């Protein structure tokens, strides 16, 4: 008895996902420094190292370094699930951190995914994102932030 790829994915995740979307992706945080500006960029990628190289190539005046990727915490997901996690976490980040574009007038490529560190450290940022992910993973029926018990209306979750 053989199991097709579609059947296997349905059995594992309980999701009906097109085979074109059966790719594993992960989330990342890049620290970006230019003169006195320090920001971080949060997003998802199929290959974080390739994304890091592309960002460095596009933003040559910025010093860019990876400070976290989800696979280091043994977390990576199918592309549609990663996209949902990314959207929800961006929503929480907008409540917690100042958007880069709200503080500075320049518009580097990808500025919509950039946040100002403010008073927070790299570790605070990483821990906050990991905490958000943990809440999402512990509640598999969560479809939005209101479904997540500990994050509901709590912009200062750290």
Model-derived segments and spans:
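Non-catalytic accessory segments flanking enzymatic or RNA/DNA-binding domains
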Residues: 1-158
């Amino acid at each position: 008895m053989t199991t097709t790829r579609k059947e296997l994915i349905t059995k594992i995740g309980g999701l009906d996902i097109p085979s074109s979307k059966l790719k594993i992706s992960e989330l990342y945080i890049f620290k970006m420094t230019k003169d006195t500006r320090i920001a971080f960029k949060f997003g998802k990628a199929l290959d974080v190292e390739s994304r890091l190289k592309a960002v460095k190539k596009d933003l040559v005046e910025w010093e860019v370094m990876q400070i976290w990727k989800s696979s280091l915490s043994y977390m990576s997901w199918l592309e549609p699930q990663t996209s949902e996690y990314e959207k929800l976490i961006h929503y929480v980040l907008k409540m917690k951190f100042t958007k880069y574009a709200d503080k500075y007038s320049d518009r580097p490529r990808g500025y919509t995914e950039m946040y100002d560190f403010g008073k927070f450290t790299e570790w605070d940022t990483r821990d906050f994102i990991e905490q958000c992910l943990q809440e999402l993973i512990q509640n598999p029926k969560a479809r939005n932030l209101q479904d997540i018990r500990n994050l509901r209306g709590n912009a200062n979750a750290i």
